A protein has these predicted regions:
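A conserved regulatory-domain signal marking ACT and ACT-like small-molecule sensing domains
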Residues: 1-90
């Protein structure tokens, strides 16, 4: 399974989750886990996804999510799970 981690941070507004989830569904990216909080008007979300079925290259998805974030006024980052695994190896 090709897992990725998506983080979304910015000022809270209506439709952030809907727009991100619609993009993922349209690209055959399955959400495995999601956590979302709002702290003093600021939106923060972390998602873990399975990207096995998507036809797009990882770099394209990263770029498109960043552009989507700009459109809706948040910062969206997409990283491969391996990065986090490597950070915790000694």
């Amino acid at each position: 399974m090709k897992k990725t981690i998506i983080t979304v941070v910015g000022k809270d507004t209506v439709g952030i989750i809907a727009r991100v989830c619609t993009y993922l569904a349209d690209n055959q990216i399955n959400i495995l886990d999601i956590s979302q909080t709002i702290v003093q008007g600021f939106f923060n979300m972390m998602m873990i996804e399975d990207m096995n079925l998507t036809k797009k290259d990882f770099g394209v998805i990263v770029d498109e999510l960043a552009k989507l974030g700009e459109e809706i006024g948040v910062v969206i980052k997409c990283q491969k799970e391996e990065i986090f695994d490597q950070m915790h190896r000694i």
